[in-house]
Amino acid sequence: MTSNPPDLRPDLAPKPTFGTAPRPDQPTLGMVSLGCPKALVDSERILTRLRAEGYGISADYAGADAVIVNTCGFLDSAKAESLEAIGEALKENGKVIVTGCLGAEPDYIREHHPRILAVTGPHQYEQVLDAVHAAVPPSPDPFVDLLPATGVSLTPRHFSYLKISEGCNHKCKFCIIPDMRGKLASRPAHAVLREAEKLVTAGVRELLVISQDTSAYGLDRKYDVNPWKDGEVRSHITDLSRALGELAPADQLWVRLHYVYPYPHVRELIPLMADPENAVLPYLDIPFQHAHPDVLRRMARPAAAAKTLDEIRAWRAICPDITLRSTFIVGYPGETEAEFQHLLDWMDEAQLDRVGCFKYENVDGARSNDLPDHVAEEVKQNRWERFMEKAQAISEAKLASKVGQTLQVIVDEIDEDGIATCRTKADAPEIDGNLFIDEGTANLSVGDLVTVEVDEAGEYDLWGALR
């Protein structure tokens, strides 16, 4: 992965803590979760099922009877990281079960690590459980093995990823996710809302809505209507977002939307984000990938970059405080210097708030591998540096304009010196910036939503004082 990762990286988040110590003679398992938040949610579901069957969860290799490695296979660099993690687990523990996206290539994994116990593909929960049962038989004690209503969480207690669908119907040439995770399969709206309600009741202050294609949610279900409370809710991203934003008052809950593909109906979400009574944040994580129409066509992406600028202007007219985050690929096969300069010029016009970028690399099975005119590595690096220099300048100017403003922030961490690491509504965990409070934090707790006045700005971060 690059130093500015294109995806959320929950594996970089603080290490989770698990309830109580295992009871005597309780079988225990370890979990290594790599890749994106969708994989993290899969890990949480696997661990929740295993906890319900009486397994304990070990935070280290030594205390585990076996280790599950949930892999990533999106990029070749991610595959290498997954193989390294499998090797480490084998060395430190010896009993290893592999699952996740790289699990779709069992022969490839066994070629490198023939001693693994089993391999399963992504979101194949039952097969993972079968492999665990074979390696470490369960030993449940229903009077002792208590499980929280929200299941096992691998994130800090005040925020949680909420997966609303699996798979993707797009055929972007650089991506193999549809091959690994299949076509779009949306969860029923009432099932998503029930899970979200449990999380909020348990004290979660921020719901991060994720999927492979959030704005396509419900398309495969023909936007069916589901019963919810005293009424109904449609399986459509606008209706679902509105209902999520009504689970708690807007000063007590944040709902953040990620992976929002730039469909025309995204504009329906913007008035919701501008509504101060709804908890849906004015924040869109929307993967543009590039701006030049010819590059977008070679990617098999929507190629109307000029219309995208019009959409951005329309969004900001309705919701001036909206934060736009996006990711881009530089050095895509065939990308010329003129096409790259077009992207830089587009960035000047779009003025995106948060930007990630990564250099193109081949991925086994991706159609882009066979495109002509691959870009030299030194050219990719040069373009990445120039792109990030542009993005940094835009970020620095935008953050400087926030000095003197009063903002609501969520507290993520308080260190031993009393310095609080927080985030504004414009900042998603791990991938965006932070706001730091240096003093007066004695009465703060992780997860608090508080008001601060911004008194200093940097390239990506802010500093402020409680108000």
From Swiss-Prot:
InterPro entries noted in UniProt: Elp3/MiaA/NifB-like_rSAM, Methylthiotransferase, Methylthiotransferase_N, Methylthiotransferase_N_sf, NA-bd_OB-fold, Ribosomal_uS12_MeSTrfase_RimO, rSAM, rSAM_horseshoe
Gene Ontology annotations for the cellular component aspect, listed alphabetically: cytosol
Residue ranges constituting the Radical SAM core domain according to the UniProt record: 154-397
SUPFAM superfamilies: Radical SAM enzymes
Pfam family, one: TRAM_2
Amino-acid positions noted as binding [4Fe-4S] cluster 2 in the UniProt annotation, renumbered to this chain: 168, 172, 175
Free-text cofactor note: Binds 2 [4Fe-4S] clusters. One cluster is coordinated with 3 cysteines and an exchangeable S-adenosyl-L-methionine.
Record's keyword annotation contains Transferase: yes
Location of region: Disordered: 1-27
Main subcellular location: cytoplasm
Source organism superkingdom: Bacteria
Cofactor: [4Fe-4S] cluster
GO molecular function terms noted in the UniProt entry: 4 iron, 4 sulfur cluster binding; aspartic acid methylthiotransferase activity; metal ion binding; protein methylthiotransferase activity
Entry's family note: Belongs to the methylthiotransferase family. RimO subfamily.
HAMAP family documented for this protein: MTTase_RimO (MF_01865)
Protein name: Ribosomal protein uS12 methylthiotransferase RimO
